[in-house]
Amino acid sequence: MKMFDNIKNVGKLIRLERIFDKKSEKTVIIPMDHGVSSGPLEGIKDMRIATNAVADGGANAVLGHKGLVRHGHRGYGRDIGLIVHMSAGTSISPDPNKKVIVTTVEDALRMGADAVSLHVNVGAETDFEMYRDLGLISETCEYWGMPLIAMMYPRGPKIKDERDPEVVAHAARLGAELGADIIKTNYTGDIDSFKDVVKGCPAPIVIAGGPKTNTDEEFLQMVKDAMHAGSAGVASGRNVFQHKDVRGITSAICKIVHEDVEVKEALNEIKI
């Protein structure tokens, strides 16, 4: 895949091909790590049902903690990539922005992971600890041939707008500089400003799905705009697993990301 021409580690390349579409060279990832931060949310109370639905809808990978591997493995049907999330923190913690490492790259390998991910809140009071974790774990990932996804979110006392193009660009570049192969970050809200974010980051960027949107059309238009701005894909959780038609919305996203269809056409995938 052309976007990974700079990666010479054959193990990473083989695993990246499992979570990216080989034809479009894009990806649709469904994060399901919310149970740790927010508890048993509607839509992921049964992770196997959620995993089955997004796999049937065409998603390239699911992302979650260790429990997703044990309780969400489908064991049949269409294969789907597995990304093990290594960071944890809760909404009821005294410092919700602090993320700690709760597993190892080696453990993720034993679980059959195709990639690992870390969460970094850029601007948090403990951000320096998360930077250190990212930098050191990137070295372990390189050793084992494990792709590393860095969730780089501008969050903290000095961050007035988490979608401000300047801070999003800084967060994305920071993740790439510290060794991440793929960056997940906020969409800035318009094509031109996000083009600048993509241009300033040497690693491919996938956009976060963000808060649950009011309409399917609004959400899918954001996906369409992000792809036109140069995004390498989408990593959306609540807008997918809390949808009335999980399979349908997943399929609609995949149509836009992989086939570049218009939003109106993609909406036809949603049956409920």
Curated annotation (Swiss-Prot):
Record key words, sorted: Amino-acid biosynthesis, Aromatic amino acid biosynthesis, Schiff base, Transferase
What domain of life is recorded for the organism? Archaea
What EC number(s) does its UniProt record assign? 2.2.1.10
Asked if the keyword Metal-binding belongs to this entry, the reply reads no
Q: Which residues bind 1-deoxy-D-threo-hexo-2,5-diulose 6-phosphate?
A: 33-37, 153-155, 209-210, 237-238
Catalytic center at which residues? Answer: 33, 153, 184
The catalytic activity, as recorded, is: 1-deoxy-D-threo-hexo-2,5-diulose 6-phosphate + L-aspartate 4-semialdehyde = 2,3-dioxopropyl phosphate + 2-amino-2,3,7-trideoxy-D-lyxo-hept-6-ulosonate
Q: Name one GO biological process term.
A: aromatic amino acid family biosynthetic process
> What molecular functions are annotated in GO for this chain?
fructose-bisphosphate aldolase activity; hydro-lyase activity; transketolase or transaldolase activity
Top-level EC class, please? transferase
Name the Pfam families for this protein.
DeoC
Record keyword ATP-binding present: no
Function field: Catalyzes a transaldol reaction between 6-deoxy-5-ketofructose 1-phosphate (DKFP) and L-aspartate semialdehyde (ASA) with an elimination of hydroxypyruvaldehyde phosphate to yield 2-amino-3,7-dideoxy-D-threo-hept-6-ulosonate (ADH). Plays a key role in an alternative pathway of the biosynthesis of 3-dehydroquinate (DHQ), which is involved in the canonical pathway for the biosynthesis of aromatic amino acids.
Summary of subunit composition and partner proteins? Homodecamer.
HAMAP family to which the protein is assigned, alphabetical: ADH_synthase
Give the family per the record: Belongs to the DeoC/FbaB aldolase family. ADHS subfamily.
**Protein name listed in UniProt:** 2-amino-3,7-dideoxy-D-threo-hept-6-ulosonate synthase
Instruction: State the species of origin.
Output: Methanococcus vannielii (strain ATCC 35089 / DSM 1224 / JCM 13029 / OCM 148 / SB)
State which gene encodes it.
aroA'
